[in-house]
């Protein structure tokens, strides 16, 4: 009966999409001619400090400052609509961050962090780009996702109910296509970062980050570096390093949206 119910639900969704095809085509055309919507998500905030560096640097402060710098660079040329999930020292629950991206019909969601992770005796170091996956790519990714997913608990926020099995199946179908765009952007971003800043070994990793679970918005989580490493902390508070990092991320975003922006005034060239 469960299988029949899932099949029936899928059929209804397919019929609904087909009935709405002309409207969907119109909306798709309108969106193609609109400015891409980018949501930048500075991690943590408010009561949730995030990581604290060996020299006392607060993750919640450094990622907010960097997000504002990246926003300003992306604003040049007027190519995008850019939103921050927070622009001050405010705590935003993980589910609400995801919902912000969905409500804004974002074309790209970038969560920005600078965590503290220790693997045995080796301190993680270097920028890392994470995408969503059901199974973590490695122990570090698993540890980091578990830490990030505790954010709401730290702030005393009640965890949201998990979706029903049927709903989860249907959402997973939608996530698969979105995930391919997320991976494509992650690879594009790493391609730009590798000539600008130090990257961790195997810089594209994946795990079950709650903040990346929007089924309809390509999403990545960028670790600028690791505050548990004194060398990374020094870079993270360096204005010159932040400029290089933001410039590389800006170019990656331009590359990602270049096909859509081709021919428009102010569009970036190859």
List the model feature ranges, each with a label.
Residues 3-166, 175-187, 243, 247, ...:
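Catalytic-core regions of hydrolytic enzymes
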Residues 118, 170-270:
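Active-site-adjacent mobile loop/cap segments within catalytic or ligand-binding domains
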